[in-house]
């Protein structure tokens, strides 16, 4: 399970995100959207994420 402050990415690829909150099944992650030139957040199930190395 991930904790607040962890850096993660989708297993399928994508931007580096920081975990800003967690639950038993998911993590809310914040990332910078270059397309919109602003920060955004998304809730993703833990199984779809991996630690950024």
Label each PLM-derived region with a short phrase:
Residues 7, 11-53:
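Basic/aromatic-rich interaction segments and small domains that mediate binding to polyanionic partners
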């Amino acid at each position: 399970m991930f904790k607040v402050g962890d850096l993660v990415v989708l297993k399928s690829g994508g931007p580096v995100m920081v975990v800003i909150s967690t639950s038993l099944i998911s993590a809310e992650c914040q990332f910078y959207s270059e397309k919109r030139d602003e920060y955004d957040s998304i809730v993703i199930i833990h199984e779809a994420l991996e630690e950024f190395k």
